[in-house]
Swiss-Prot record:
Keyword check for Signal: no
The keyword Metal-binding is annotated on this UniProt entry: yes
Cofactor(s), by name: ATP; Mn(2+); Mg(2+)
UniProt protein name: Phytoene synthase
Highest taxon in the source lineage: Bacteria
NCBIfam families recorded: PhytnSynCrtBRhod (NF045921)
InterPro entries, alphabetized: Isoprenoid_synthase_dom_sf, Squ/phyt_synthse, Squalene/phytoene_synthase_CS, Trans_IPPS_bact-type, Trans_IPPS_HH
The enzyme's E.C. designation: 2.5.1.-
Protein task: Involved in the biosynthesis of carotenoids. Catalyzes the condensation of two molecules of geranylgeranyl diphosphate (GGPP) to give prephytoene diphosphate (PPPP) and the subsequent rearrangement of the cyclopropylcarbinyl intermediate to yield phytoene.
Family: Belongs to the phytoene/squalene synthase family.
Amino acid sequence: MIAEADMEVCRELIRTGSYSFHAASRVLPARVRDPALALYAFCRVADDEVDEVGAPRDKAAAVLKLGDRLEDIYAGRPRNAPSDRAFAAVVEEFEMPRELPEALLEGFAWDAEGRWYHTLSDVQAYSARVAAAVGAMMCVLMRVRNPDALARACDLGLAMQMSNIARDVGEDARAGRLFLPTDWMVEEGIDPQAFLADPQPTKGIRRVTERLLNRADRLYWRAATGVRLLPFDCRPGIMAAGKIYAAIGAEVAKAKYDNITRRAHTTKGRKLWLVANSAMSATATSMLPLSPRVHAKPEPEVAHLVDAAAHRNLHPERSEVLISALMALKARDRGLAMD
């Protein structure tokens, strides 16, 4: 059980650091809301610790430390930090499969490498780790292990991350980061390296953004078919999360896909309206027949997450994939230290 003092720290972290999720979480039942806030607080702290350091060597070191912290959490001896203790309680109570938070750490390792993503599949592989894994963990918190529900939760995670990528193109470029499919950029005559050196809201970059958001919209649409597989009192919160993040893409579109000179956002009032609308939508959709699209196969990039969550593999050793990612970072760290 999560200590109340730790829970209060987690609530404050999300209230001030993730407005969209905080708004959606308000309509989740308490039995899911508090563990979800603890999960998101751990993810937020982990992301900030990697994102806020400047030098590549420091980012690599931050990811390596996170790997050790996750090891301690699954060993039942979390570090003396509220988010670690709270997440350790969640892991124990809900039998959280270790592959899911490990996937998140692998995504952070990719961030630390400064990796580029050449194809849509590459972008989805990254989004699977930093967002779809969280969607699968949310299903675990709702005590849902149905593979179809997990696949649709992963669709939602992919779509939400694509919305974030589309919103943050300019901000990321100015920080030397690039998450758009570079082959799409090349098709538009955009040299990725030149774009990072001087990001401009050209017609080509707007078309790439529109294309990515169209893909996100298709995933949001398919994800919505899975809401019926969730506990009734959880449906409004999950629908709200999807609507709030989809609204980010709508704001980007409203700005004619200029994500370089402006950063799209939704107002607090708009978020609250979407939350209220989701409560009504959840009731209405419960009266409709289940869509056959709910049974669609998971995207190949998230299949391992669906499998891990469905089969309750709680305490494996560190996965070979994560070990490889961490070893690559260690080697890179040593190389940077020698420069």
